[in-house]
Structure formats: structure tokens, C-alpha cells
Design a protein with these regions (language model features):
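A short, N-terminal amphipathic alpha-helix
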Residues: 30-47, 83-87
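Conserved core of the sugar-phosphate nucleotidyltransferase
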Residues: 62, 104-184
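The conserved acidic donor/metal-binding loop of glycosyltransferases
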Residues: 98-100
Length: 198
């Protein structure tokens, strides 16, 4: 199964473009959300759910299962993800940001990975960041791994050695992994995810 997080508005977009959810941006002849759904279908994943928020009615045309984050203005992606708890605690789920592109190989690698939580990342992130920003550390976050385990992720840094890659916005949870995730972050869950991001 797949869960696509589309609750956010896309606050960094120009006002004209933010009239629609961010995932409705068109690249070529398809919107981002259309491309994501197509990628999942082509990979054999037909049970797809959307976690909606901003302008939820726009997504009705896709005729997909939806979970709604009514507090989308004040909460973050982890809060949105927990809205799909009924799926995550029972099924293996690929979770995707609703505004990303990735090679099908990244999705395939996640599907065959045996870990209870599997995170996709780009080890060649610097090439893209150099195109996007004047300084390569602008908007980059820590990503440190050892023995296939993540030691640190998602913090600001001024040290290039703290960044072994960048999280791609694509992650797989097995039910046992989701259970561990919730247990580790119990305090954040209890505090409405005030300081936690995915």
C-alpha cells in the first residue's frame, strides 16, 4: 500500500501557484500527484491513500481512500501521517511526500528492502543542491548513517561531513516498524508533534 502526504499548502510557492495544493503543480503534461499515482500503479501498488488538508475537495477526482488532517495549518507531516494509523499498524506501507520526484529504482529498492523501517536517500545530493542554492549547505540537513542505521537526520548543520545524503521524502514502514516509531516518539505524539518532522 502507499500513502501520499498532501495536507500542506506549499507556503514557499508564489501566491498565484498556491491557489491549488502544491502537488497540483504541472511538470510537462502531468501534475506531480498524477505522476506519483502512476508510479505506484506501475510498481504494482494499487491501494493508495491520500492524507489531505488544504483544499481537500481538489483530490476527490482521484477516487482514492483519504485520511484528513483537519489541523493541517498548525501541524506537520508526522501529525498528518498518524491520521493513516489504521493502515500503518496493519499493512506494509510506502509513505511519500506529495511534492517529490524520484526514479522508479528508488521505489523498487524500498519494496525489496527487508527492514522494518526503510528510508530512501540521495548520496549524490550535492549536485542538485549546487543548482538550487548559492551555498551548498543552504536548506541541507544532517543525514548520518552507520551500519545501515540512521544516527541523525533533519538537523541544521554547517559541517559538510554531517551530510552523507539527503532524505528523499520516501519511506517504507512495516507494521512492526511503525509500532517502534510510535513508541520512540511517544512524547511527541502526546504533545501533538509540536517539534517533530519527517
Amino acid at each position: 500500500r502507499a500513502i501520499i502526504l498532501v495536507a500542506g499548502r506549499g507556503s514557499r510557492l508564489p501566491k498565484k501557484l498556491s491557489l491549488n495544493p502544491k502537488s497540483f503543480l504541472k511538470i510537462g503534461d502531468q501534475t506531480i500527484i498524477e505522476k506519483l499515482i502512476k508510479n505506484f500503479h506501475q510498481s504494482g501498488i494499487n491501494k493508495i491513500a491520500l492524507v489531505t488538508g488544504y483544499k481537500r475537495y481538489k483530490f476527490k477526482k482521484f477516487c482514492l481512500k483519504t485520511f484528513h488532517n483537519e489541523k493541517w495549518k498548525k501541524t506537520n507531516m508526522v501529525f498528518s501521517l498518524n491520521k493513516a494509523n489504521s493502515w500503518l499498524k496493519r499493512y506494509k506501507c510506502i509513505v511519500s511526500y506529495g511534492d517529490i520526484f524520484y526514479e522508479k529504482k528508488a521505489l523498487k529498492n524500498l519494496l525489496v528492502n527487508k527492514g522494518s523501517i526503510s528510508v530512501s536517500y540521495d548520496p549524490f545530493w550535492k549536485k542538485l543542491w549546487k543548482k538550487r542554492f548559492k551555498k551548498v549547505l543552504d536548506d541541507a540537513e544532517t543525514f548520518r548513517i552507520k551500519n545501515k542505521n540512521i544516527l541523525e537526520i533533519g538537523k541544521k548543520t554547517n559541517k559538510i561531513n554531517d551530510i552523507q545524503g539527503q532524505y528523499m521524502g520516501l519511506i517504507k514502514f512495516e507494521p512492526r516498524g511503525w509500532k517502534k516509531f510510535k513508541a520512540c516518539l511517544k512524547n511527541d505524539f502526546d504533545n501533538k508533534f509540536s517539534n517533530l518532522y519527517l
